C-alpha cells in the first residue's frame, strides 16, 4: 500500500535493534534520522521499499532488516528523487534519479536496470501513465526548459524503457486507451486500441493554454498529428481538462466556457463516447470526485456546497457509465475533495458513508459546525441504514479524516471491518473515539479497544493489529479471534505511531510500523517489523473454516446482488490457528439467483421515472425502418429495461423486465417537420426596450433553453426562456434601473435598483436572491460591479459606490468586496477610480490580485489617479504608476495610460500583473495627453492602440499603433483612422479568423483640418496590420449591372468598396462577422472613391475572409447569422416592411419571407451571441394602418424548415466525407494558402447540404506544418516606417532600439542581432524562407566563447579551400559543358519539342544545377546592396532557392501589384522567383 500521510524525508541509517517476547510476535526496530517516504510492498512478496532522503531502502523480510539499493555500478546511491511501483505488474517499479539517469526493476527489487532520457522529470505528481494489460508500455511526462520557456514533452516506451521515443513535444497529459486491466473486458476491442494513446493539447492559437483539445493516435503521433476525439455526439469538444481510467471506463472531463459547469464523457471502448447525464444536478469545476467504482458502474461524488464545510451528493451510474442516479445527499467531504465513502473490500454492494445531519444549518450559515453521522448500505446504495453498536448509533471517522495509509475500514480479509469512532448522536473528535470491530461486514459492531488506534488486518483476518494513536506508546495490541479479545506486545521504545501497514492482500502475518520518537533535541524515526509467524504452530484445518455469506438481507438470510449470492470460506473466530496461505487472495463462491427487479436497469435512451419504478424515454426513440408512418401508429421496441451487463441471474422462473413491448409512435422520433418557418409576435406596452441580454447556454449543457432578460423604458423586467416566443414579467415593484450581467458566467444576472438593494439570479431567472450593499451606486460613471474571472470564484464581487454625497459633502467613490456573493462586504479602497480582479490564469499565483485606480492623496478634487495593486485586499499595496489616465485588462495584457513628465501620453503593459514595462512609441509620435486614446484589441499576441491625432469635435481621426508580443515596443500600423466623439474607432477584427481587420480612414485629412466634413475609405489587412489595402469591389451590383468604376485586380483610392463601420452602429454587438461563421462577413456600403451616406448604401457579403465581395441586395439592411452561418437573415433598416430575406447557401440565393401582416419598423435583429441558434428575434414597432401601440418582438423559428431539420454529420478523421469541407484562408497576394507562417484549416458546412450545424463546436480543424517566411510575415521595426514601395526605412534623425538590450534583459542570452528594419509579426510561426530580421549576429559582452561555440567559423586553409575549390570546379565543369553540350546557348532549332534526353541536355542535372547556382549567385549579389537580409533558406542549408510555387509569373505581374501589399524593394522580384523576361518579349 502506498503511503498517503507521511511527515518528513531524509537519510542516515543509525541503528538496528531487535526485541522478541516469548510467545509473542517478533519485533525488530531500525532507526533513521529522517522519516521514510513512498513506502510500498511488491505484491505477493515480503519485499518492502521506501525512499529515505536520496536513497532507496529495501527489505526482503517484511521490515525485519533493511539495506540501501545500490543499483548498477552503485549509481543509485544518493541519487534517488522518487519511486513509483507499477500498479498492474507486481514485480515492477521505477526509480527516478536527480539527474537524467533512472532505474527500473522487473523482479521485485532483486536487480535494477538503468535508462537515460534527455529531459527532466516534473517535481510533482506521478510522471508515468501505465498501460492496463501490457506492463512494458508506459508514457513518461517530462519537462524541458530553455530560459523562461518550458515545454512538456511526453515520451513512450513499448519495451519497458529499454528504448524510448518522443510521443509529443508538448502536452497537458497523455494516457493509454487501456488504462486498467478491466478496460475492454466486455467488448471486442480491435487490435489498434492496444496502442491507442490520448493526449490533451493546448488549443490552436489559444493564449495561456486555453481551449485544451483531446486528441488520439494509434501510431504514437508518428504519421499524423492525431485526431480530435468526438466526445459530444460525434464532434470534438474544447477545453478538455482531464482524462482518467475507472475500471472498465475511460472518463474525460471538459469545462464549459462562461459557466462553472463541468461535463463528463464516458466510453467503454475508446471509440464511442457519451455525455454523462446526472439526475437533476450539474457538475461544477473541480467539484467532483470519481470514487472507488465497480466493474458495472461508476461512483461519483459531486460537491453541493463549498467553503469551510463542503458536502457532496453521491451518484451511481448505469452499466454504460452514462446515466447517473443520486444515491445519497449531504455526504461529508473536505476541501481537498476527499469524500466519506468507502466500499467494503471483496464484497459487492456494501459501502459506508458519512452524511451531515444538520445540513440545513450549514446551508444557512457556513460557520456552523457539521454534525456527521455514519450510514451503511448493503444493496449498492439503494437503501442506507444506521450503523449500530448494540442498540446505539455508531459513527466512524472516514476518508475525509485519514489517519493511516491504505483503505480506512476493511481489507481483503472477508467480512472483518474496523474503524475509529463513537456512539451517540453524531461523530465527535478523533481523540474522543474508540476502536470498533465488525465480524459480519458491518451488520453488527462492538468496541474493541478504548481510545483511537491505527489498525491493520493480517492472515485474512486471523490477526488484527492495533497501535495507540492519541500519543506516544510502547505497546502494540493484537487479536486472533476477530477482535473479541486483545493482547499486547512490548515495542523496543516509545514512539508516536505514524503508519501501520502490511501486504496489500492482507494474507501475511508480518506488519510494518513507522513511528517517531524524541532523540535529544531532535526527532528520530523507527521502522519496526512485527512478525506473528511463530505465535501459533498449528495451521488451520478443514474444521476451522465456515461457509460465510457475504451479505444478509433483513431476514438475516444470504442476499442476492448482480444475480448471485456471495460466500467465502473463512476461519472461525474461535479457532486458534493461522491460515498460513500467504499471498493467496480469498476467492468468493457464487450461487446464482432468480432474476428480480433489482437485476435490471434502464435501457439506453431511457431514464428512471420520478417514483423510480419505471423507465421512461429520455429522448426521441429510434424507430425501425418502415414503421410509424402515422402519428397514432404503434411499433415494437425496447421495454425500457435491460439486464445489467455482467449480471448472471437466472431468468427462468424469475422476472423478465427486458421483453420487447409495443410502444406508441408518439414516443418515437420528434414531431414531423412542418417544412415551414414559425412566427410568434409579442407586444409590450412600453415604447422600447432599454436594454436586453442573452443568457446563453454553454454548448455542453444538457439544458437547451434560449433565455433573454429585458428591461423596458418603463423599467419593467421581462424574461423569456424560449427566445421570445413567450415572455414573463418578473420583479414587479422592485424598481430595477439597470441590468448587469456577470462578465464571466452566463447563468448569472444582477439587477441594480435605485437603492442599496441588488437582486441576483444565478440560474437564469428560475429563482432570485437579494443582498444589500454598503453604498448606493457611484456617481462617477464607474462600473458598479466587477467580477472575478475564475469560474470557481464567481461569487467574488467588487461594488463601487458613492460615499459622503450629501449636501456639502466630500462625495467620492469607495470600493467594497465580497467573497460570498454579497452577503458580507468589506472595505477595499476609498477614493477609487475603478477596480478589477486579475485572475489566477494571468497572475499565476493568487486569486486575490486586484488592480485599482485611486485618486492621489485620496483627494477626489485631484484628478490625478495612480495605479495600485494588492493581493491582500489592500492590507498592503504596490504603486505601479502615478498620474494615470486609466487602465484596461485585455485578453493578454494589462494596459495603463499615464501622463509623462513632458505632458505626453505614456503607456505601460504587463502580462502577469506584477511587472510593467513602459511602451516605446514610434519616432515623431509625441502624443499630447489631452488627446484621446482607445485600446482596440490584444487577442493576437500584441496590443492595438488608436491614438487621436486630430481631436476637433466631429472631425476626429488618429493613428493605429501596434505592439510587439510583450506590449512594450510600438510601431505605426496605419494613419488617419476614423474616430467619433465617443472615442469609438472604425476598427473591427474579423471574428473567428486570425489577422483580418477592417478600418475606415479619413481620405481628405487636409480639408478636415480646415473644418470640412470627413470623407472615409475602407481598408483591410490580412496579416494583422503589417500591410493595409483598399477592398477590391465586385464587378456588378445585386441587379447585375456593372459599377461605374472598375479597378481591376485590386482596390484603389479611386475605386474601392467602402463600408459603414463601428462608429455608425446603434448596437455595438452587431458586427460584420460571427465567431461561428468562419470566413463570412456582411456589411453595408458603396463602391466609389469614398463612403457615401448609409441611406445610399447597398448590402454586401464576403465568403472568403474579405478577399472577394459580392453585392447581395440593393439598399440598406441589418443582418444576423444563425446556425453558425448556415442561415442568414436580413431585414430593411429604418424602412417599414412586412418581409425579411434569408439565405441557406451563404448568400448565393435569397428567399423572401413575410413575417407580419402589418408593416413594421425593425430596429434590431438578434440571436444567441454564438450565432448557433435557428431562432431569430426581430425588435420593432408596427406602423401605419392597423398598428398596435408599444413595441413588439417577433420570433422567427427556422427549426421546422425541412432544409434545416436534420443535424449535419461531422467526422474528425474523415472531415470531408459528409456535410462539411475543409476551408483554408489565404492572403490575397500569395499563391499558396500560407497565412502567418502556416496553413490553417477550418470545418465549414457545405452550402448545398440540407442540414443544421447544431451546437457550437471547434471549427478549427488543424494547423499544418509551418511554411517558409515571406514578406507578409514581417512588419516594420521600432523607429522604422513603411515607404511607398512597401519597404521599411529608418525615420530620419532617429536610431533603432539598442540591440544589446537583450544581453542585459536576459542573462542567458549569448548574442544579439543587428537591426534590419523588420521584425516578425507576433502571430507568425513561419520557419526558414525569407529572413528579414536578425540577419547578422554579435556576441553579448563576456559571452564570446559561447558565441564561438554556437557559430564555429572556418580559418586559414579551410577557408581558402572552401572558397577556391567550388569556383575551380564550376569553371572546369562549365568549360566541358560549353564545348560538348548539344543544346548550346543561343542555338534555336525549329520543330524541337523538348530536350534530347542526353545527359548533357538542358534538362540534365549536370547542366541545370550549375545554371541554378550561377543564376542564384548573380541574383543575390545584385540584391545585396539593396536588401542584405533577402536570403532564402532551405531545409538543407543556405542554398538560395525560391518557394515551391512562384507568386508572380513575370516582372510585369509583380510591378502591377505595387502600391498595395508590396513590401520589398525594387529588385526583389528576382529574389522572389520572377521570370527573366516578360511574357511578350522577343527572344
From Swiss-Prot:
Question: By its UniProt entry, which SUPFAM superfamilies does this protein fall under?
Answer: Oligoxyloglucan reducing end-specific cellobiohydrolase (SSF110296)
Cellular component per GO, a single term: membrane
Identify the InterPro entries for this entry. Sortilin_C (IPR031777), Sortilin_N (IPR031778), VPS10 (IPR006581), VPS10-sortilin (IPR050310), WD40/YVTN_repeat-like_dom_sf (IPR015943)
Name the Pfam families on file.
Sortilin-Vps10, Sortilin_C
Segments on the Cytoplasmic face: 1378-1405
Write down the membrane topology. Multi-pass membrane protein
Compartment(s) of residence: Golgi apparatus, trans-Golgi network membrane; Prevacuolar compartment membrane
Q: Where are the transmembrane segments?
A: 1357-1377, 1406-1426
UniProt BNR repeat ranges: 58-67, 103-113, 375-385, 436-447, 478-487, 718-728, 817-826, 1100-1110, 1141-1151
Question: Where this protein primarily resides, as one coarse class?
Answer: Golgi
State the UniProt keywords alphabetically: Glycoprotein, Golgi apparatus, Membrane, Protein transport, Receptor, Repeat, Signal, Transmembrane, Transmembrane helix, Transport
Name its GO BP terms in alphabetical order.
Golgi to endosome transport; Golgi to vacuole transport; protein targeting to vacuole
Q: Check the UniProt entry and state the signal peptide residues, or none.
A: 1-20
The positions flagged as glycosylation sites are 295, 966, 1262
* Lumenal topological domain: 21-1356, 1427-1483
Which function does this protein serve? Functions as a sorting receptor in the Golgi compartment required for the intracellular sorting and delivery of soluble vacuolar proteins, like carboxypeptidase Y (CPY) and proteinase A. Executes multiple rounds of sorting by cycling between the late Golgi and a prevacuolar endosome-like compartment.
Assigned protein family: Belongs to the VPS10-related sortilin family.
State the name under which the record lists this protein: Vacuolar protein sorting/targeting protein 10
